[in-house]
């Protein structure tokens, strides 16, 4: 295989299956299905990968959008899905992908980058925690104190992906 086939580059549409396999191994198999706005063939130019011997071994996804915040137009990028097979970690792949992504965002005039998750690597590249996250946990006894007669709780299925995606967006 030619050396230019390997290394850091955009995903080729024909490699979507290899990317899905990586994301399924590192995260969970349904990740591309619940993030179709990011992980899709049409967004392949914003899906940077490291390929070794024809296999996608590391990945970062980017979505770029224009938003208005209090009347100010901004170009934002959202980064996520950073994944590397365990057998390929420690080679600098994720760092190379993040560095390339940050350079592309800078060159394209992105004003603000949001990163999904936290790793020391993000901090090394200038990312910082902003805002607050809240996490609440209830045990069964505490949950039984709520009047939930007006609600139905059920498991989501593949048929719910479009509706859940619309709520997310």
Kindly give the residue locations of the regions a language model identified.
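Short coil/turn motifs at secondary-structure junctions
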Residues: 65-67, 87, 120
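Short amphipathic alpha-helix that is part of the acyltransferase structural core
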Residues: 1-59, 63-64, 71-78, 144-169
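Gly/Ser-rich phosphate-binding catalytic loop and adjacent alpha/beta segment
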Residues: 134-142
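Short active-site oxyanion
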Residues: 102, 106-112, 151-152
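Conserved active-site alpha-helix within GNAT-family acetyltransferase domains
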Residues: 107-111, 117-135
């Amino acid at each position: 295989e030619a050396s230019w086939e390997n290394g850091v580059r955009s995903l080729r549409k024909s490699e979507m299956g290899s990317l899905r396999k990586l994301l399924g191994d590192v995260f969970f198999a349904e990740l591309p299905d619940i993030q179709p706005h990011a992980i899709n063939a049409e967004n392949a130019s914003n899906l940077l990968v490291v390929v070794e011997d024809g296999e996608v071994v590391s990945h970062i996804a980017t979505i770029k959008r224009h938003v208005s915040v209090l009347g100010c137009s901004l170009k934002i990028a959202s980064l996520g899905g950073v994944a590397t097979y365990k057998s390929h970690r420690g080679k600098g792949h994720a760092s190379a992908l993040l560095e390339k992504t940050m350079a592309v965002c800078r060159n394209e005039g992105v004003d603000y980058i949001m990163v999904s998750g936290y790793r020391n690597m993000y901090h090394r590249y200038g990312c910082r925690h902003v805002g607050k996250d809240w996490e609440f946990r209830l045990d069964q006894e505490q949950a039984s104190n709520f009047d939930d007669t007006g609600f139905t709780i059920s498991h989501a299925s593949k048929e719910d992906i479009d509706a859940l995606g619309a709520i997310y967006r």
